[in-house]
Swiss-Prot record:
Gene: lft
Gene Ontology, cellular component aspect: apical plasma membrane; cytoplasm; cytosol; subapical complex
UniProt family annotation: Belongs to the LIX1 family.
Coiled-coil portions: none
Stated name of the protein: Protein limb expression 1 homolog
Membrane topology: Peripheral membrane protein
PANTHER family to which the protein is assigned, alphabetical: ECTOPIC P GRANULES PROTEIN 5 HOMOLOG, PROTEIN LIMB EXPRESSION 1 HOMOLOG
Biological process annotations from GO: autophagosome maturation; imaginal disc-derived wing morphogenesis
Organism, as annotated: Drosophila melanogaster (Fruit fly)
Chief place where the protein resides: membrane
Location in or out of the cell: Apical cell membrane; Cytoplasm
Amino acid sequence: MVYPEEPFWVLPTVTGFYEDRDYRVNVVEALQEFWQMKQSRGAELKNGALVIYESIPSNSQPYICFVTLPGGSCFGSFQNCPTKAEARRSSAKIALMNSVFNEHPSRRISDEFIQKAVQDARTSFKGTSQINEGTESGIGAFRFMLEANKGRTMLEFQELMTVFQLLHWNGSLKAMRERHCSRQEVVAHYSNRSLDDEMRSQMALDWIAREHDNPGVIRRELVLAERELETFRMAGRELRFPKEKKDILMIAHNQLGGSALNSATIDD
């Protein structure tokens, strides 16, 4: 499946926001209160308004923290943070900025939004060897998903978006297409599923099978996912997709009983 790039997923830079000096707002509290307010005003948040933080285990700086918002979007600390608390504040800061910007009418899925998004998705493959039946089918599924979620904002749509990105990456969409499953059936099924440990474990099993057929494929994919995740994190971009790819591949790697892999892998 293919997806548009800017301006749909990337937040424009706001001068001064990233500077720590004279920044007196408690961004961690402000972020939680923002989503609680949205819920109280009627926003449909199937998993509630809780903002979830995940600190990466480390005995030395820079510390890294990820934050997942109620709609499924994920952001990471984008600065070199000397403490775990600062890493949490850094991740909350970029997430709060995106949450506020997400309220702008341009972030709401509309007919005009869908037309532009699909056009950009198709243009991103124009003139390349990647245009094929699968690409066109992916674009069609992308349009169908957007049309089924009119009126929602992009952050509220993010978890479903990530699920279908993972299904495409994992080869599951192709397999369902070969079984003649309709777009409506696939979207309806996964719209009611959460991106949880069960789904990750199922995808990890697929990668374990691939590893048996093609030794080293998990490590190669993990290198790519690590690089993408680090690039997105330092740029302050939404990063749920690369983070989930890394988590799924690590589950597969650990189940195979392989040797430890860490961030040094990305230098290979």
